[in-house]
C-alpha cells in the first residue's frame, strides 16, 4: 500500500499545522515498514537546505520505505491551480501512483485514490470575525468541497468533530478522532538547564507566557488588558508578560493595546521561538496563559502542561477537553475573569505543576501514529 501525504505545511511552517504534520508522520512511518509513503510538498521558492527539509531527508534516510517528492511549484500556485481554478490534474500526475491520499491541512488535492482529509478547526465558520476575510472566503469554498470528496475526515478533538457535523453536515460515520501528542522533550526541566536560556533570550525573572500567532482569535488584546488589571495598584510588581509568536493578521492592535495601557516596560514580545528553546521557555514561565476564543485542539496548552507550567486557558471549544482538571479555565470574553484566573494559577502553583504532566501523558504521538495506521488500513479495505 502506497500512502501519499501532503507534506507542504511541514516543509514550510515552523509551528501549527507544520509541526503537527512533522510530529505525526515522524511517529507513524517507522511503525509498519510494509507501508510505503510518498511525502510530497510544494517546493517552488523554498530554500533548498531549509531546516525542515534536512529533517525530512533524515527521516527518509532512516526509513527506506519513505521517499520525499518535491513538486517544483509554489504553494500559492498549487492552490490557484487545484482550488481556485479547480483544474482536474490529479496529484498522481505529479507524484506517481498512490493508494491513499492523506491531506493534513484542510484541503484535498484532486486524486484518484481514497482520501483522508484533516480538518483541524472551523474558525472560519464558528468565529468568522477572527479570520482574515480573504482566507475565510477561500476556506468557505475549499473545505466543504474537499469534505465532499474525502472518504474519511480526521479531527483533533471531539469539539471539532461536533462542529464538522453540525456546521457542514458530515455524518459521524465518516469522522475519525485522532488526538495530537506531545514530544517528550516537553517535560519539567531542572533550573540549571533553563537559566542560560533566560539570559540568552533576555527573559525577566518572573513572567506570564503566551505562545502562538499574534492574531485576533488568540484574544491577546483582552489578555493584555487583564494583565493591566492584575498588576494595577502595584500588585505583582515584578511580574511581566511575554508574548512569543509570529505576527499574524491585525497584529498591530496588540502592540497598540500595550502602548495604550502604558505597559511597554512590562510586556515583552519575542518573535518565533525555535523548537529547541520552547521547553526551556515554558519551564521558566510562572504561568502559561492562553485565552483563545476558539481552538481545534491547542497544542501550546498541551506543551505547557507537559512542562509542569501552571496553565490558564479558555473554557470553550476543545480546550477543556485537553486540560481536564489540570488547568484554570476562564471565560475568554471576561477580562476580569482572565485576571482572576491568572491570580488563582499563581496561587495554586504547586498543585498545577504536579497536575499538568499527568494530564499531558494522556496524549502521545505514538498513540496517534497507531491510530493513524488503523485508519489507513480501514481506507485500504474494500469499499462497502
Please give the residue ranges for each predicted region:
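Carbohydrate transferase catalytic cores enriched for Leloir-type hexosyltransferases
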Residues: 1-384
Amino acid at each position: 500500500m502506497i500512502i501519499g501525504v501532503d507534506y507542504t505545511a511541514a516543509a514550510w511552517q515552523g509551528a501549527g499545522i507544520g509541526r503537527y504534520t512533522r510530529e505525526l508522520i515522524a511517529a507513524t512511518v517507522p511503525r509498519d515498514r510494509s507501508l510505503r509513503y510518498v511525502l510530497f510538498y510544494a517546493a517552488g521558492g523554498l530554500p533548498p537546505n531549509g531546516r525542515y527539509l534536512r529533517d525530512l531527508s533524515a527521516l527518509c534516510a532512516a526509513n527506506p520505505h519513505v521517499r520525499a517528492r518535491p513538486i517544483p511549484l509554489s504553494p500559492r500556485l498549487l492552490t490557484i491551480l487545484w482550488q481556485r481554478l479547480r483544474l482536474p490534474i490529479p496529484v498522481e500526475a505529479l507524484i506517481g501512483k498512490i493508494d491513499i491520499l492523506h491531506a493534513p491541512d484542510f484541503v484535498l488535492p484532486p486524486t484518484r485514490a481514497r482520501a483522508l482529509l484533516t480538518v483541524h478547526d472551523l474558525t472560519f465558520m464558528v468565529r468568522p470575525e477572527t479570520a482574515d476575510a480573504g482566507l475565510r472566503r477561500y476556506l468557505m469554498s475549499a473545505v466543504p468541497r474537499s469534505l465532499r470528496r474525502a472518504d474519511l475526515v480526521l479531527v483533533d478533538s471531539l469539539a471539532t468533530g461536533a462542529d464538522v457535523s453540525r456546521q457542514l453536515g458530515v455524518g459521524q460515520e465518516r469522522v475519525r478522532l485522532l488526538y495530537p501528542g506531545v514530544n517528550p522533550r516537553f517535560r519539567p526541566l531542572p533550573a540549571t538547564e533553563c537559566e542560560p536560556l533566560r539570559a540568552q533570550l533576555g527573559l525577566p525573572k518572573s513572567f506570564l507566557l503566551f505562545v502562538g500567532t499574534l492574531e485576533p482569535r488568540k484574544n491577546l488584546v483582552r489578555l493584555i488588558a487583564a494583565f493591566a488589571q492584575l498588576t494595577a495598584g502595584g500588585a505583582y510588581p515584578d511580574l511581566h508578560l511575554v508574548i512569543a509568536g509570529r505576527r499574524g493578521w491585525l497584529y498591530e492592535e496588540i502592540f497598540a493595546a500595550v502602548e495604550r495601557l502604558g505597559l511597554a516596560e512590562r510586556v515583552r514580545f519575542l518573535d518565533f521561538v525555535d523548537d529547541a528553546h520552547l521547553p526551556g521557555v515554558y519551564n521558566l514561565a510562572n504561568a502559561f496563559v492562553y485565552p483563545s476564543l476558539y481552538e481545534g485542539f491547542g497544542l501550546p496548552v498541551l506543551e505547557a502542561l507537559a512542562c509542569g507550567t501552571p496553565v490558564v486557558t479558555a473554557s470553550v471549544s476543545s480546550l477543556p477537553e485537553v486540560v481536564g482538571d489540570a488547568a484554570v479555565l476562564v471565560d475568554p470574553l471576561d477580562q476580569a475573569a482572565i485576571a482572576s484566573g491568572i491570580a488563582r494559577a499563581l496561587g495554586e502553583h504547586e498543585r498545577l505543576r504536579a497536575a499538568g504532566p499527568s494530564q499531558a501523558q494522556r496524549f502521545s504521538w505514538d498513540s496517534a501514529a497507531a491510530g493513524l495506521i488503523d485508519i489507513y488500513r480501514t481506507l485500504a479495505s474494500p469499499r462497502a
